[in-house]
Structure formats: C-alpha cells, structure tokens
Amino acid sequence: MVLGKVKSLTISFDCLNDSNVPVYSSGDTVSGRVNLEVTGEIRVKSLKIHARGHAKVRWTESRNAGSNTAYTQNYTEEVEYFNHKDILIGHERDDDNSEEGFHTIHSGRHEYAFSFELPQTPLATSFEGRHGSVRYWVKAELHRPWLLPVKLKKEFTVFEHIDINTPSLLSPQAGTKEKTLCCWFCTSGPISLSAKIERKGYTPGESIQIFAEIENCSSRMVVPKAAIYQTQAFYAKGKMKEVKQLVANLRGESLSSGKTETWNGKLLKIPPVSPSILDCSIIRVEYSLMVYVDIPGAMDLFLNLPLVIGTIPLHPFGSRTSSVSSQCSMNMNWLSLSLPERPEAPPSYAEVVTEEQRRNNLAPVSACDDFERALQGPLFAYIQEFRFLPPPLYSEIDPNPDQSADDRPSCPSR
C-alpha cells in the first residue's frame, strides 16, 4: 500500500467580530479548527495543539572588564500568562510506534475543533517592541510514524481593554513653565509657555485639541511646537532599557521678540498605535504630549502632559469635558458646551488600527538627547508614513481659561 501525503495543515479561528480578525480579551473563549488536507491515506500517531501567551524581553550590553577585556552582558526576562495543551487525535506518547497506536486518516479535507479559555486575570496587550514583545499563539503538531512532525504556529491578538470614560482619564491635563535666557552678564526677558488639553485618555484616530499660549519676551526668534511620544520600557534582572519614539508632531508660527501666540484648540491627530500597556511587570508602554518652544542656541522650553491610549472610545454623552472636535461642526461655540443632537462617537481601536499599521507607525528617535540639538537639522524628524496637513481653521475657545493669565505682565514695549 502506498501511503498518502500531507498536502496542507492550517489553523483557523472562529472570529466573533465584524472585521474577521482574531481579537480576544481576558476571560474570552478562543475556539477554532485545525484543518488537515491529505492525498491518499495516512497513518497518524497524534495531532496536538499547544496554546501559549507570554511577555519576553531581551537586550545585550557591552561591558569593559579592564585590561582591554570586554564582554557582553545579556538581559532576559519572561512572564507567562497561560499555557494550554490538548490532544485532538491519538495519545500523549509520540514514541509509541506500535500499530495499535496509529490512527488512519483518509484522503480529503478534515477539520478538528479546539477550544480553550483565556485566564480571567488581566493579560498584557499584544505588542512588538524594540527589546521585547507580548505574543499569543496556537501551535498544531501532526506526528506520524517514522517521519518528522508537521508543525504550524498561528498568532492571535489580545487586548487588555482600557476604557477612557473613567474619571481619571477624563480629567484635563495642564501645565505652565517659564525660562529666562542668559548670555554672560546679559539677561533677556522670559519665555513663558502654558498648555492644556481636555482629557488624559484618547483612542487612535482621535485628534487632541491643544490650548496653549506662548509669550516671547526674549530677544530671540522662537518656534512653538507639539509632539506625541511613545515610551517603551523593558525590565530584566533589575535593569531597565528605555526606547522613546515620535508618533506625531506639529509646528506653530515663528515668534519674534515681544510677540505672543495662542492655540485655541490646535489639532494633533493620533495615528494608529498600540494602546498603552500599564499592567505588565516587564514591559511598559506609555504616551505623552510634549508642547515645547524651540529656542535657537539654548535648551528648549518644554512641557510634558501624560496621555493614555485606550481601546474603548469616548461615549458621546460620557462627560462635559469630552472632546467633540471630530463630531461637531466647526462653527460650534465650545464655550457654550452645546452638543449636537446625535454626535458620532470616535472610532473604535479595531476600526482604525491594523497589526501592520501598528508595527509600521513608529519612527525611532534618540531617547537620551533631552531635546538638545546635538545633530544638524530639525530636532524631531517626521514619520515618513504619516505626513500631516496643516490643522483646519478652528474658532472655538478654551471653556476654562486661566484667570491668572490676564494678570500676567506682558512683554515690555521695545
């Protein structure tokens, strides 16, 4: 008898969402099928699946041991979230080559269902970073007598949902800073920066309204700017490795001496990025909005406002502090807080982010320069995949103006 051959071995998931993409959360049931197609008749010892979820970090550092001796120090750490095994055909022992242990599979296509439940405890969101990752996968192994096993692995995505409708993420973020430039014995007037955003939590695809006032009482020409940064932190063996990446930015008008610029809701759109990861012990992903003043020949004046990128978008009537920039007409008076009859909610995370977009979106930048211009050219490079048009005209004003701003002395007349 001529034995048949394995033509294909595939894994498919039973997707329960409209996008037909396998996306799950803690406590969900992951189900699917192992699809086997054979030509002719084959004998099988076992068909197994192995499902696993884990976070893993790894990086290396060069060390100097003295006397021109150098060595490499490896830093690795791993956290396992679940480990599930099941046998779809056959038995546990693959070394049993007796005829009694074989199962015959006839020519054609065959499906073998599998199912397992994810832990109820919080799981880290799927992530691919510079020095680590969070991955979830199912692996199928087909074992046959006297032949090498056929193996296949397929990943699926897990989101640990972050609801931005919680009070802590709906609270406004604001700050004020001032800087005085000195050159030898000469001191110029101060440069002041005040900035505020409506809330801390956003989802990809939303635009952040930036309210800011920049006053230039110095003798130099300055430029106000804003940027969204992602910070990846990896932990292993008591050490920490950090990577900072630019995800979006914008530039204001140049300010000459004695001038002031006001941003009344300047828009900065959040591109497709991974949500924040805050509950993993070895990988942490955080975001911040940096509003800053580019000062030639001096350290920049910058103000960091923390952000959380979530997966559950803002409810249309969730809060009076909710951003309505993407749902309301441009001529709506923001001060009156009048809402449209049926505003459209911001897009959900799955609607705007694909795995390919998330991986390709981030452009690495140096994390240790702290905004010093050590190299030629602009401080922040554009992400080539995301070139932003100028923000639309916006006539809305800050509903909660800083009363002390009216009492602040303006630049002296020149």
Swiss-Prot record:
One of its GO terms (cellular component) is early endosome. Highly expressed in skeletal muscle, placenta, kidney, lung, liver, blood, adrenal gland, lymph node, mammary gland, thyroid, and trachea. Very low levels in colon, thymus, spleen, small intestine, bladder and bone marrow. Strong expression in differentiated adipocytes compared to preadipocytes. Detected in omental fat and subcutaneous fat tissue. Induction: By troglitazone and pioglitazone (selective PPARG agonists), by prostaglandin J2 (PGJ2) and by L165,041 (a PPARD ligand), by vitamin D3 and, to a lesser extent, by phorbol myristate acetate (PMA) in the promyelocytic leukemia HL-60 cells. No induction by retinoic acid, nor by clofibrate (a specific PPARA agonist). Up-regulated by fasting. One of its GO terms (molecular function) is beta-3 adrenergic receptor binding. GO terms for biological process: fat pad development; heat generation; negative regulation of adenylate cyclase-activating adrenergic receptor signaling pathway; negative regulation of cold-induced thermogenesis; negative regulation of heat generation; negative regulation of locomotion involved in locomotory behavior; positive regulation of hippo signaling; positive regulation of ubiquitin-protein transferase activity. InterPro entries: Arrestin-like_C (IPR014752), Arrestin-like_N (IPR011021), Arrestin_C-like (IPR011022), Arrestin_domain-protein (IPR050357), Ig_E-set (IPR014756). It is a peripheral membrane protein. It is found in: Cytoplasm; Cell membrane; Lysosome; Endosome. The keyword rRNA-binding does not apply. A motif (PPxY motif 1) lies at residues 346-349. Pfam families: Arrestin_C, Arrestin_N. Changing residue 52 to E: Abolishes interaction with ADRB2. A motif (PPxY motif 2) lies at residues 391-394. Residues 393-414 are annotated as: Disordered. It comes from the Eukaryota. SMART domains: Arrestin_C. Changing residue 153 to E: Nearly abolishes interaction with ADRB2. Residues 405-414 have a biased composition (Basic and acidic residues). Adapter protein that plays a role in regulating cell-surface expression of adrenergic receptors and probably also other G protein-coupled receptors. Plays a role in NEDD4-mediated ubiquitination and endocytosis af activated ADRB2 and subsequent ADRB2 degradation. May recruit NEDD4 to ADRB2. Alternatively, may function as adapter protein that does not play a major role in recruiting NEDD4 to ADRB2, but rather plays a role in a targeting ADRB2 to endosomes. Belongs to the arrestin family. Interacts (via PPxY motifs) with NEDD4 (via WW domains). Interacts with ADRB2. Interacts with ADRB3. Interacts with HGS (via PPxY motifs). Does not bind TXN (thioredoxin). Interacts with ITCH. Interacts with WWP1 (via WW domains). This is Arrestin domain-containing protein 3. It comes from Homo sapiens (Human). The lineage of its organism: Eukaryota, Metazoa, Chordata, Craniata, Vertebrata. The gene is ARRDC3.
